[in-house]
UniProtKB/Swiss-Prot annotation:
Main location: secreted
Keywords, ordered alphabetically: Gaseous exchange, Lipoprotein, Palmitate, Secreted, Surface film
Cellular component terms per the entry's GO annotation: extracellular region
Gene, per the UniProt record: SFTPC
Function: Pulmonary surfactant associated proteins promote alveolar stability by lowering the surface tension at the air-liquid interface in the peripheral air spaces.
Native source species: Canis lupus familiaris
Database matches in Pfam families: SP_C-Propep
Covalent lipid sites (S-palmitoyl cysteine): 4
Location in the cell: Secreted, Extracellular space, Surface film
Gene Ontology biological-process annotations: respiratory gaseous exchange by respiratory system
Name of the featured protein: Surfactant protein C
């Protein structure tokens, strides 16, 4: 297997989580703005 795969996968997972959190905050702000 590829030794760096788990570390890359973890980094990708962290990036996805951060993006989701940002989207949730933006949507929440828009909903509160409405």
């Amino acid at each position: 297997g590829i030794p760096c795969f788990p570390s890359s996968l973890k980094r990708l997972l962290i990036i996805v989580v951060v993006i989701v959190l940002v989207v949730v905050v933006i949507v929440g702000a828009l909903l509160m703005g409405l």
